[in-house]
Amino acid sequence: MNGEYRWLSSLNNLPACLQRTRCADWGVLNMHVAIFVTVVAIVVGFAAPTCANDRPSDPFGNDTIELNKETALVEMWESLRDQVLLDRAHFRSCIESNNQSNDTDCAAVSTLMKIVEEARQNQGKALLGHLNRSINLLINAAPGYLTGPLEVITVRNGDCKSHSIAKYGAARAAGFSADHVRLVTVHDRRHNFDHMVAVVFYNGEWLILDNLTNLLVRDTEKRDYAPLAVLDYKGVRRYRSPYWMID
């Protein structure tokens, strides 16, 4: 895994520890409805909460502070949200063409919705487990960077960031509130590399969707993951004490 996680190397104004990184077809009507739901879910997921009064504290503990807007990670995250807005235009184009376009983005829309619709045959943890496993199987391990969900699904290659972004979008499309889906960069203390995961709040606990395993694990159980920063529609926050967990 050496050399695969370079994306935080240019960060400034962050603690030194934050600078070490590795990190089918279906009916036309159903497609119209499914794509519309996905457009709303993904775009809104990067912009606003579903319920303003239903926001749990951050995973891995709540001792976080906002990063300065000039910090490189913040700039990258804001750029990613701009890319998601471009994805919305591609979704609309697919709707107008009844998904008959040869555009690769329409193929990505179809792939994403197939994963989400299959996951919706389950509930709760089983739904999230299906999303995690399906995206892990879809994306091949390769060096990656922060980009929108459609590009990730189109290329089908990427690292932990690519998996996490795709899972973020898929969880939102599956109906989870923007307040209940976040991305977290962590330091794997056991293997000594930095990593990114998607986390989803369900039934009072944060569940980790990780490209390194198909199993869902609670944040409180993953003692070898020391949190570094958390990203969501509100912005980017870092943990005051990155290595907050005590052996």
Predicted regions and their residues:
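A structural boundary/capping signal
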Residues: 5-7, 14, 49-247
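Generic alpha-helical structural signal
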Residues: 5-6, 18, 23, 47
